[in-house]
Amino acid sequence: YDGTDDGMATASFAAGTLSNAMDCMIAVRRDSDANAVCGLYESVSDANKVFGIAESGSGSGCVGSGAGTPTVWVDGVQLTGGTAVTRGTLHTALTVGEYHVLEFRGLDLSTWTASGFGLYTSYVLNGAQGGILLFPSSTPTADRDAARTWLGAKVGLTL
């Protein structure tokens, strides 16, 4: 990553590989105040299978209907809005120039057949990611906490 228009190559897999009870943690840094998808998306042509949309002042949800109704956390703190966190709330929480661990709990990715990061049309991330973890929602709390701490430490955070 050089911090400009970087993305992750799309990973492809069979539908059903992921479940309707998935959690995702991403160490992410926005280097500009521009709107961006800071989470994952299945395809840039499917506006519903996306999560982590950060858009200044927007009252729309930060998770598309094709990704379930997860709760959203930044640096271990749940964002206001429950399972309906807005794009504006996420945009504010992910401060520019700093790494954060962005977390989604309770994603439904059971129909996804691919995933990508950073290059979502019109919402390209100008920044970097320091790691992505995707795991079952049933993961014990102690393991989830250890994963968050490890991911944060990779990018210089103490969580």
Placement of each model-derived feature along the sequence:
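Extracellular glycan-recognition modules
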Residues: 1-71, 110-112, 137-148
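Short, aromatic/His-centered strand-loop micro-motif at the edge of beta-sheets
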Residues: 11-12, 65-98
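Extracellular/lumenal carbohydrate-interaction signature centered on repeated Trp-anchored short motifs
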Residues: 12-24, 33, 90-100, 122-128
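A structural signal for beta-strand register positions
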Residues: 27, 101-106, 133
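Short, hydrophobic beta-strand segments that form beta-sheet elements in well-ordered domains
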Residues: 62-65, 100-105, 118-120
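Predominantly extracellular/luminal cell-surface or secreted proteins
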Residues: 73-75, 118, 135-137
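Extracellular glycan-interaction patches encoded by glycine-rich segments
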Residues: 107-130, 138-139
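Extended recognition patches within non-cytosolic domains
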Residues: 131-159
